[in-house]
Amino acid sequence: APSDTTIAETLTITEEFFPD
């Protein structure tokens, strides 16, 4: 399973591509 750091990085990158 991915580490919490990897999950956090993914969420940050997702925010860049799909900003609220």
Curated annotation (Swiss-Prot):
An annotated GO cellular component: extracellular region
Location of this chain's protein in the cell: Secreted, Extracellular space
Principal location: secreted
Transmembrane segments: none
Ranges where the record places region Disordered: 1-20
One annotated GO molecular function: serine-type endopeptidase inhibitor activity
Alphabetic keyword roster: Protease inhibitor, Secreted, Serine protease inhibitor
Tissue distribution of the protein: Hemolymph.
Role noted for this protein: Inhibits trypsin stoichiometrically. Also inhibits chymotrypsin very weakly.
Descriptive protein name: Trypsin inhibitor
